[in-house]
Swiss-Prot record:
Gene Ontology annotations for the cellular component aspect, listed alphabetically: mitochondrial inner membrane
Regions that span the bilayer: 49-69, 81-101, 140-160, 174-194, 201-221, 244-264, 271-291, 307-327
Keywords: Magnesium, Membrane, Transferase, Transmembrane, Transmembrane helix
GO MF annotation, one: 4-hydroxybenzoate polyprenyltransferase activity
Xref: InterPro entries: Prenyltransferase (IPR039653), UbiA_prenyltransferase (IPR000537), UbiA_sf (IPR044878)
Main location: membrane
EC number: 2.5.1.-
Alphabetical list of Gene3D superfamilies matching this protein: UbiA prenyltransferase
UniProt protein name: Polyprenyl transferase andD
Length: 327
């Protein structure tokens, strides 16, 4: 039997298991025209937490850069941060589409993902591939407005975004690939005409902080699918450390808080940063870890959304207050 015939048979069997009437997973998607619905799903328009998680590294990096810069940053600070956030949104969206293309046959075997557009046949491979390429190109259009070195940073981030789905297939550590979103720190510094290597240790500590928070969030999500991931042959740190996930999650809370303290200490931050930024991060993520420990499969997205949003807000507020306090 040819590969094409086998693929067609798998697609047919997948469709046979689908409900006759498809209901969009959120009100946001239900408002889209029917022809746009699968593309909205590919972009994860119904998963706003993902947009928060990809934008916050650039917002945090901007506040951090302003705090450690030897002089007041240029007047176009906010326009450049906006361009970086728009880049991150399109990077995330294109990455989600690419992930669905690479994982469609695995997604068909997992209850939470079997109704995604590709497994249910709502879009073809070629349509999804063109859509992913167009989405990435839109992101690069924003990067083109930044200093030239940012294009190199963007290509590095794109490489890891494309690599991610294969990390799930060939290892139990795809979250380490996701952690490379920490590259937002040097990219933002380049975008603001700062040299990351002039502040190597604070920059590395902040990179580690962003990476550890991203890894922790994804492990919390992956915990929902451990049984099905094992059956489907999908690797993750949640699968690898399934018997000590609570300990790992709490360790990541403490490790990320320690990285933030190191970044603040070496960046000459003051009391407002350690009280508001570090305290807010530690408090909210400790709450999230405890909530996940009590019930890892119920209300995870609700708790994660509120904790991440609140912790990010306090992190940035602490940096801004600290900057004003020291000026």
């Amino acid at each position: 039997m040819s590969a094409t015939t086998t693929e067609a048979k798998q697609t047919f069997l997948c469709k046979e298991r689908l409900p006759r009437r498809y209901h969009p997973p959120s009100k946001v998607l239900s408002r889209l025209p029917t022809s746009f619905l699968p593309y909205g799903e590919l972009l994860r328009l119904h998963k706003p937490l993902g947009y928060i998680l990809v934008c916050y590294p650039f917002l945090v990096a901007g506040a951090f850069s302003a705090s450690i810069a030897p002089e007041v940053l240029e007047a176009d600070f906010w326009p450049r941060i906006t361009l970086l956030c728009l880049w991150s949104i399109f990077l995330r969206s294109g990455g989600c589409i690419w992930d669905d293309i690479a994982d469609q046959h695995v997604d068909a075997k997992v209850a939470r993902t079997r109704l995604r557009p590709l497994p249910r046949g709502a879009v073809s491979n070629s349509q999804a591939t063109i859509f992913a390429a167009g989405t990435f190109l839109c992101g690069f259009a924003f990067v083109a407005e930044l200093p030239g070195v940012c294009m190199v940073d963007a290509l590095i981030m794109l490489f890891f975004a494309v690599l991610y789905p294969y990390g799930k297939r060939h290892s139990n550590y795809p979250q380490l690939i996701l952690g490379t979103i920490g590259w937002a720190i040097p990219m933002t510094m380049h975008g603001l005409n700062l040299r990351p290597l002039d502040h190597p240790i604070p920059m590395a500590a902040m990179f580690a902080f962003i990476a550890l928070v991203t890894i922790m969030n994804d492990i919390i999500y992956a915990r929902q699918d451990i049984e099905e991931d094992i059956k489907a042959g999908v690797g993750s740190m949640a699968v690898r450390f399934q018997h000590c996930l609570d300990a790992l999650t709490f360790a990541l809370v403490f490790a990320s808080s320690a990285a933030l303290v190191i970044a603040g200490k070496l960046g000459n931050m003051g009391a407002p940063f350690f009280t508001i930024s570090v305290g807010g991060h530690f408090g909210f993520f400790l709450f999230l870890a405890m909530a996940n420990q009590r019930d890892p499969k119920s209300g995870v997205e609700w708790a994660a959304k509120r904790c991440c949003t609140s912790a990010t807000f306090l992190l940035i507020v602490g940096m801004v207050v600290d900057l004003v306090w020291r000026s």
